[in-house]
């Protein structure tokens, strides 16, 4: 019987690749998707569809009540515009949800302990390091230190693409034969991707770097 692993799966291309990576490694993934009140709720719908198609264990957990305590992010507050441009720009800090990955990983670790799983996979990568403190190698290292002492059972947090950028993730996923039309990246909660937010810009750059056209629909195309 293969080992169980909890995969934090948003529905985006990074976690989509991580999910398949776990399966390729012969692990049994338990996908965990969080509704934290994000305006790009479409990613949850995509995650459900993918997991159903793959026959993967999947839970969608509503933690949107945290927004009674945590605010100031354009991802959860519709009164704040989602910044346009590249992630390296200072304006992209408006997309930071305070303490998000610490909260999500804490819940995922608890789920892993309950399942008897020894690892939690999540899709942090080098393109996130500039803006998101909770995607940096030092954060993963320190969270692993905490995870090692928080329970009787040790759970490792593993980010297979921590030192890869999005184009590298895409390259690996393409080598696995993955279909990225089954992913959602845009931070704006509209029917088509905007093509202008940091998440869209980075995604489009990744496809361009791999000499490909992005298979999802954009508003300006």
From Swiss-Prot:
The keyword Electron transport does not apply. It is an enzyme of class 6 (ligase). It holds the Pfam family QueC. InterPro entries: QueC, Rossmann-like_a/b/a_fold. Binds 1 zinc ion per subunit. Pathway: Purine metabolism; 7-cyano-7-deazaguanine biosynthesis. GO terms for biological process: queuosine biosynthetic process. Zn(2+) binds at residues 186, 194, 197, 200. Its cofactor is Zn(2+). It comes from the Bacteria. The keyword Cell wall biogenesis/degradation does not apply. ATP binds at residues 9-19. Its EC number is 6.3.4.20. Keywords: ATP-binding, Ligase, Metal-binding, Nucleotide-binding, Queuosine biosynthesis, Zinc. GO terms for molecular function: ATP binding; ligase activity, forming carbon-nitrogen bonds; zinc ion binding. It catalyses: 7-carboxy-7-deazaguanine + NH4(+) + ATP = 7-cyano-7-deazaguanine + ADP + phosphate + H2O + H(+). Catalyzes the ATP-dependent conversion of 7-carboxy-7-deazaguanine (CDG) to 7-cyano-7-deazaguanine (preQ(0)). Belongs to the QueC family. This is 7-cyano-7-deazaguanine synthase. It comes from Psychromonas ingrahamii (strain DSM 17664 / CCUG 51855 / 37).
């Amino acid at each position: 019987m293969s080992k169980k692993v909890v995969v934090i799966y948003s529905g985006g291309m990074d976690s989509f690749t991580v999910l398949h990576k776990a399966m390729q490694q012969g692990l049994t993934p338990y996908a965990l998707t969080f509704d934290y009140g994000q305006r790009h709720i479409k990613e949850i719908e995509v995650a459900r569809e993918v997991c159903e198609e793959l026959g993967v264990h999947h839970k969608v957990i509503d933690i949107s009540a945290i927004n009674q305590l945590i605010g100031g992010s354009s991802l959860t507050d519709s009164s704040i515009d989602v910044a346009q441009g590249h992630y390296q720009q200072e304006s992209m800090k408006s997309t930071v949800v305070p303490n998000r990955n610490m909260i999500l990983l804490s819940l995922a670790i608890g789920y892993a302990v309950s399942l008897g799983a020894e690892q939690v996979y999540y899709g942090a990568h080098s393109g996130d390091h500039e803006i998101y403190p909770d995607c940096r190698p030092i954060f993963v290292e320190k969270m692993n230190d905490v995870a090692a002492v928080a329970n009787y059972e040790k759970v490792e947090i593993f980010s297979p693409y921590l030192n890869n950028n999005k184009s590298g993730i895409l390259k690996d996923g393409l080598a696995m034969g993955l279909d990225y039309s089954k992913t959602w990246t845009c931070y704006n909660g509209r029917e088509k991707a905007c093509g202008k937010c940091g998440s869209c810009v980075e995604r489009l750059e990744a496809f361009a770097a791999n000499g490909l056209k992005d298979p999802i629909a954009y508003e300006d195309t």
